UniProtKB/Swiss-Prot annotation:
SUPFAM superfamilies: PLC-like phosphodiesterases (SSF51695). Its main location: cytoplasm. It holds the Pfam family PI-PLC-X. One of its GO terms (cellular component) is glutamatergic synapse. This is PI-PLC X domain-containing protein 3. It comes from the Eukaryota. Widely expressed, with highest levels in brain, followed by heart atrium. Not detected in small intestine, nor stomach. PANTHER family: PI-PLC X DOMAIN-CONTAINING PROTEIN 3, PTHR13593. GO terms for molecular function: phosphoric diester hydrolase activity. SMART domains: PLCXc (SM00148). Residues 22-197 form the PI-PLC X-box domain. It is found in: Cytoplasm. It comes from Mus musculus (Mouse). One of its GO terms (biological process) is lipid catabolic process.
Amino acid sequence: MASSQGKNELKFADWMATLPESIHSIPLTNLAIPGSHDSFSFYIDEASPVGPEQPETVQNFVSVFGTVAKKLMRKWLATQTMSFTGQLGAGIRYFDLRISTKPRDPDNELYFAHGLFSAKVNEGLEEINAFLTDHHKEVVFLDFNHFYGMQKYHHEKLVQMLKNIYGNKMCPAIFAQEVSLKYLWEKDYQVLVFYHSPVALEVPFLWPGQMMPAPWANTTDPEKLIQFLQASITERRKKGSFFISQVVLTPKASTVVKGVASGLRETITERALPAMMQWIRTQKPGESGINIVTADFVELGDFISTVIKLNYVFNEGEANT
C-alpha cells in the first residue's frame, strides 16, 4: 500500500506519522483527510431484518420478496467493499457511523446499520482499536451521526463501550483549532469521537456533532455535486470546526429502478469518478479549503492517495492557512 510523493514514499498505513515535520503543528481542521461514507457497510448482512429507519414501502417490498429483495438492497446500500482494517491500512482516517438497535432484541445489542443491519458495534470498534495499537501515531475520527431505535440506556451502553475499548486514547473535546498531530502525539491521543446527540454535552470525550458539519448535496448529477461542494467550501466557517466534503452521489428512486440489478457502484459511482477525482485534485487544504473528504468505494481512482498528497502543499508554502 504505497505510492510515491516526490522522493518520499507514502506508506498509507502510517501516512500521518510520515508527514513532514512542518505539518505536525498545523491544526487537523486545516489538513486534508480521507474518509469513507457509510464506513461500516462492507459488513451489511443480507440475512438481517430491515432497519427501523426504512419507510413502509421498503418494509413491504422485503416482506413480499424476502431474500431476493435484500440482495438487491445490498447492491445499493453497501457503499464500501473494504473492512475497517482494510480501510485503515489504505489510509482512511474518518469513519461515518450509524447505530441502531434491532427490534425485539432481548440482548439490547448495538449494530451499525444502513437499511439493513451490519456488524456489532463493539466488534467494529475493537477492530479499529487493534490497528491504532499497532500504529500509535495514526489518528482517527469516529463520527456517530445517526441513531435509530436508541433510548437513554443504549446511549449509556455505547459511551461505556467507547471508554472500555479506547480509554485514554480518546481526546477530550476542546477548541478544534488547538488539535494538531503534535498536540495529540504529546498526549498519546488517537481517537476523536463526534456524537450527534445531546448526550455529547454530558461526556468530556464526546465532541458535539455540530463540530463535524457534513453538507449533503443529495443529487445524482456530478456537475451539481461539484457546484455544491465548491459552494460549501466557500461558505465554510474559518474557525471553530472540522468540515466534511461528501464527494458522494445519492441515487433517486428512479435511478435505483433503472439499475436495480447493477447497484450503486456500477450505475453511479464509477461513471462519475473522473469528474469527482478531477475536482479533488484541484483543491487545497486550509482554513478556507477542504478538510475531511468522504467517498463511496474508497479504493477507486486513487481517491485516498490523492487526498493525502494535498497536504504536501503545506511543505511547498502554498497553503491557505
